[in-house]
Amino acid sequence: MEEQPLCTLSVKDLMEAGAHFGHQTRRWNPKMKLYIFEEKNGLYIINLAKTLYQLRNALPHVCKVIKENKPILFVGTKKQAKCVIKEAAIEAGEYFVAERWLGGMLTNMATIRNSIKTLDKIEKDLTQNSSCLTKKEIALLAKRHQKLLKNLEGIRYLRKIPGLVIVVDPSYEKIAVAEAKKLGIPVLALVDTNCDPTPIDYVVPCNDDSLKSIRLIISAIKDNIINTKKKLGVEIVSPIKTLSTEDGSEEIDIAAGDDNRKEDLLAKKYDSNEAN
C-alpha cells in the first residue's frame, strides 16, 4: 500500500490562523456554499473540517506530480501571498510567480523565453563585458536587469510545462488559472468565499487574505514536496541563482527585491571601469 502524504494540521491550527474567516455575505459566490459553515456578523465562516479534508485529498496529487518528475508552479502575486509563495517555492526547489503574471507565461512560452534571453544577455554584459562599459551604461543595464528579473526570476529555469499550478486566490490570479486550464494543467488553489471554485481541480477553502492562513496551508504543501523529494533521493535545487562578477571576488544575490540596493552594488562593482 502506497504511503500517504503527511498532514499534521488540525482544525485548531487552521482556526488559530484565521483560516475560517470568509468574505462579507454580500460578496460571496454561491458556488462556495458547499464549503461554508455559517454566517456570523455579516461574514461567512468557512467549514474548516472541509478545508482539512480537501487539503488531505489534494496532497497525494502534489506528491504524484513530484514522482512523475514534473515541475510545480506556485502563483501568488497579491501582497499577502507573494513572500510566502516565493519562500515556499525556493525551499521546495520549485518555480514561482510572485510579482506579476505576464500574459502568456504558460500559453506563449516562446515570447517569455525571449525575455529570459534578454535577461541572460544583460547578465553576461555585466559579468563578462564590464570592461567595455561605462558606469552609466552599467547603471542602466542594472536597472533593466532588475525590472526583468523581478517578473521572471521564479520561472527563469522552467524548461517544461508544469504538472501542477498552485494558486493563492484564483479570482485574483484568473489569467494564470485560465492559461493552466487551456493547457490542461491541474490547478490546486486556496479559495475564499468570493471565488468561483468551478475551474479549480483541487479546492482548499480558506481565508486567502490572511498571511497566517496562507502561510500555514502553503507550508503544509511545501513540506510534502520536500519530504517526497527526500524519499525519492531528488536533489532540491533553488529556482534562482547568484550573479558572479567578472573577477570572481564577490557574488551578488540576484533574487529580485531591494532594486535600488542591487543596482548600486552592480554599479559600484564596476566603478573602476571609467577610470581604466
Curated annotation (Swiss-Prot):
TM ranges: none
Single GO BP term: translation
A GO molecular function annotation here is: structural constituent of ribosome
Keywords assigned by UniProt? Ribonucleoprotein, Ribosomal protein
Can you cite an annotated GO cellular component? cytosolic small ribosomal subunit
Kindly give the InterPro entries that the UniProt entry links to this protein: Ribosomal_uS2, Ribosomal_uS2_bac/mit/plastid, Ribosomal_uS2_CS, Ribosomal_uS2_flav_dom_sf
Q: Which NCBIfam families match?
A: rpsB_bact
**HAMAP family found in the cross-reference section:** Ribosomal_uS2_B (MF_00291_B)
Protein family according to the UniProt entry: Belongs to the universal ribosomal protein uS2 family.
Instruction: Report the protein name in the record.
Output: Small ribosomal subunit protein uS2
Originating species: Chlamydia caviae (strain ATCC VR-813 / DSM 19441 / 03DC25 / GPIC)
Q: Report which gene this protein is encoded by.
A: rpsB
